[in-house]
Structure formats: structure tokens, C-alpha cells
A protein has these predicted regions:
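Helix-coil boundary/capping segments in enzymes
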Residues: 17, 27-95, 102
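Active-site loop segments of alpha/beta catalytic cores
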Residues: 1-26, 80-216
Length: 216
């Protein structure tokens, strides 16, 4: 049973010979990771502006950083937001030949967050207020990210990917960041579009989310 079969059987609860694992390359892995590069979800490693116009400051050894200047402070500037071109050919050069390089490993392709990226653009407090005060505008912004994911899914499927993963941290230590009702109204239908498109293209879907998310 090869790596791809192990992962697939694990996802489907079909009694794999062992659990698949994902360690640094020198220790071995059943997964092969790929993704568009540069990604609209990238953060500048040493601080500075990202493709959306958000200004990042990094601290210490971590390259995660935090946004210090948000590009969309006022919804009246929405039409002037710098939106990365998801179709730019250079983004997709890295996935060419991924199937051949991966061998029998399970190819896991990286997507674009539809919550974290929103608050990187608007600010976290603004995003929370938008849920109640500007839901239509907020929905328009989330939809831009959804459409990017739909494009990525087709590109990855054509390149032979097996799974699609992206990250949105929804949880605090003991509760969600937003009310479950609001999450179901604004984000759940949009996640459904992404997952349905991925499944239709033959990809498994994975959503990483830190924190307490039991309520959804």
C-alpha cells in the first residue's frame, strides 16, 4: 500500500495498514505539498507590504508577524483595493510536474484563507463589526477569496493533486471568535462552494482551524 493509498484509506475510514504521517523530508512523509507561488495568502517574511497592500511587522525568529496597516480601512475604498491576479502564469509554474515529483505520495495543495485574509485586509475588530453593520460589503470581499479558491482548485486538479487544504483559525481558547449563527450565515455557504468544487474536481478537502471550534 503506497502513501497515496494510505492517506486515502485513512480519510475514508477504510482500515489502512498504518496511519499516514507528515514529517520533515529527512524523516519521511506520506504527503507532498505544493502550492501557487507567490500566493495571494503570502506574508512578507521580513516585514513590509503584501500583495493586498497590508503592511506587516515581524518579530524575532517568527515570520508570521502581524498587520500594522490595513489596506481597506473604509468600505468606500473597496473598488480601489489591490486584488492579486490569481490567473498570473508565474503563480502556477511551481505546480507543473508535481505529480511526477511526488511519486506515490499524496499531493496536498494549498488554498487561500477566506477569514484570516479578510481581517488582514480590514482589521479584526472591523471584520467583527462588519458582520453586523456591513454584511453585504463583507460578503463581497469574502466572495473575491472564494473565487480565487475556485480557480486554484481547477489548476491543482489539472496538475494531479489529491487534496486541497487551507487555514482559517476560528477559535479562541474556549469559544469561537464569532457567533455560530453569524458564521453559518456568512461563511458556511462559501466554504460549501469551495468544498463542493473541490469534491467535483476529485480532491479531498482539509480545513485547518486552531482553537475551540466545537460549536460549528
Amino acid at each position: 500500500m503506497n502513501s497515496s493509498e494510505l492517506v486515502t484509506r485513512t480519510i475514508r475510514f477504510q482500515n489502512p495498514e498504518r496511519l499516514p504521517y507528515d514529517f520533515p523530508e529527512k524523516y519521511g512523509s506520506d504527503f507532498y505539498s505544493t502550492g501557487l507561488s507567490p500566493s495571494p495568502d503570502d506574508r512578507p517574511r521580513n516585514g513590509g507590504y503584501d500583495e493586498w497592500g497590508a503592511f506587516w511587522q515581524t518579530f524575532g525568529f517568527s515570520n508570521l508577524g502581524e498587520v500594522k496597516e490595513y489596506p481597506l480601512k473604509d468600505w468606500k475604498d473597496f473598488d480601489h483595493l489591490s486584488v492579486p491576479d490569481i490567473h498570473a502564469p508565474q503563480r502556477w509554474q511551481g505546480i507543473e510536474g508535481a505529480r511526477e515529483r511526488a511519486g506515490d505520495k499524496f499531493i496536498l495543495a494549498g488554498g487561500i484563507s477566506i477569514y484570516e485574509r479578510v481581517h488582514f485586509i480590514r482589521g479584526l475588530e472591523n471584520t467583527w463589526m462588519d458582520i453586523y453593520q456591513n454584511p453585504e460589503e463583507l460578503g463581497r470581499l469574502v466572495d473575491i477569496l472564494v473565487e480565487m479558491n475556485l480557480v486554484a482548485i481547477q489548476k491543482y486538479a489539472a496538475a494531479g493533486a489529491d487534496g486541497y487544504i487551507f487555514c482559517d483559525d476560528w477559535g479562541l481558547q474556549n469559544r469561537l471568535m464569532v457567533a455560530p449563527k453569524s458564521w453559518r450565515a456568512l461563511w458556511k455557504p462559501r466554504y460549501a462552494r469551495i468544498f463542493q468544487a473541490a469534491h467535483a474536481a476529485g480532491l479531498f478537502t482539509f480545513l485547518h482551524s486552531c482553537g475551540y471550534i466545537v460549536d460549528i
